[in-house]
Amino acid sequence: MGSSSGQKPRRLEDLVDKLASGSLSHSRLEKELGNANEAALVRRLYLERLTGASLSSVASTILDFQELYGRNIENPIGAVQVPVGVAGPLRINGDYARGDFYIPLATTEGALVASVNRGAKAITLSGGARAKVIKDGMTRAPLLWTPSVYEAHRLAMWVEDRIEDLRSVVAGVTRHGRLQHIYPYIIGNLVWLRLSFSTGDAMGMNMVTISSDRICRYIEENYDGDAKCIALSGNMCTDKKPAAINKILGRGKYVVAEAVIKGEVVKNVLKTTPQNINLVNVTKNLLGSAAAGSHSFNAHFANIIAAIFIATGQDAAQVVESSMGYTWTEVRGEDLYISVTLPSLEVGTVGGGTRLPTQRELLALLGVAGGGNPPGSNALKLAEIIASAVLAGELNLLSAIAAGQLARAHELLGRGGLKIS
């Protein structure tokens, strides 16, 4: 027993030596050891020896890399931690999200949780937020080559005429997704096929990518003209990049959240007036964004979306397009109407990072962990919750700017000004 336990550290040190000499690659460690957790340890030991840095905090994690390797991570060395706070309760009156919710926000930005919290209070005191998903469809846009514009146009018509055949192709790939629409777009002799899919409770990028690949194969094998797929993603999807097409046609969940904030709540909680909030929104979010050439006509959608994405295991890179959208305000008598529109909110409750234990717990906190009943309902509920949280964040920031409170809030909460004792 003693000799075998002594052999194990020696073997790990031997593997560190092999990494250092270049005779073993990091990508082969799991196969060499048969254990992803031990492979992570060896990588840390190697990196500590190489750089002199201590990775003891990175090593401190509840994650089991045996469960994650090959699904969520390659070459693991540990994990990072981000503080999580909650804002709420936030009352939501949506088609799927109904009730009072505490919103988990993973962030290192002081004042963000407090900002959403005050906005949530104002919304809840005014009866709650209404939320609705207008459209739901994840997109992928393969790019096909043809020899001429005439062939490109013929291909586009051929594809549109065979949408039922293509739906059958997709049905053979997944039981959770369905091909909804095809939008052909022609430039010269090239054809983009913007394919839109329903994806159930998954965000769906893996599903739509595999389905799009099968569609391209079907076209190449069955089209009676000259066409070749040259890129499975032709950037008209558009994934992880700001793009007007996502704002116009939507990608993921096209969702709106709105509320009418009572005049006395604006005065007593937000410390300003509906007129001042409306003025800031029109001049800052609308005119200022237009003058800057921004794709986003809002104050800080990305703050809230990034914090919830990290907390709930969404694809953090998709904050780029998910945070594009519009904040709209109107003065209605003594009250303030405010809405946020997010045309391309890309979220899911199964797959990807939603499998991680801490993220799954926070999805459960919101009542959306795993698949919904009926299928797709949990992802729609999560979209309504996120949009309502964004509404709370926008309402508070516009109010803080209108009341001249923004700098003071960051001095107090973002620079260590708030003390427990």
UniProtKB/Swiss-Prot annotation:
Keywords: Isoprene biosynthesis, NADP, Oxidoreductase. PROSITE patterns: HMG_COA_REDUCTASE_1, HMG_COA_REDUCTASE_2, HMG_COA_REDUCTASE_4. Its EC number is 1.1.1.34. SUPFAM superfamilies: NAD-binding domain of HMG-CoA reductase (SSF55035), Substrate-binding domain of HMG-CoA reductase (SSF56542). One of its GO terms (biological process) is coenzyme A metabolic process. Disulfide bonds: none annotated. One of its GO terms (molecular function) is hydroxymethylglutaryl-CoA reductase (NADPH) activity. Pathway: Metabolic intermediate biosynthesis; (R)-mevalonate biosynthesis; (R)-mevalonate from acetyl-CoA: step 3/3. It catalyses: (R)-mevalonate + 2 NADP(+) + CoA = (3S)-3-hydroxy-3-methylglutaryl-CoA + 2 NADPH + 2 H(+). Pfam families: HMG-CoA_red (PF00368). The active site is at E109 (charge relay system), K240 (charge relay system), D315 (charge relay system), H410 (proton donor). Converts HMG-CoA to mevalonate. Belongs to the HMG-CoA reductase family. This is 3-hydroxy-3-methylglutaryl-coenzyme A reductase. It comes from Aeropyrum pernix (strain ATCC 700893 / DSM 11879 / JCM 9820 / NBRC 100138 / K1). The lineage of its organism: Archaea, Thermoproteota, Thermoprotei, Desulfurococcales, Desulfurococcaceae.
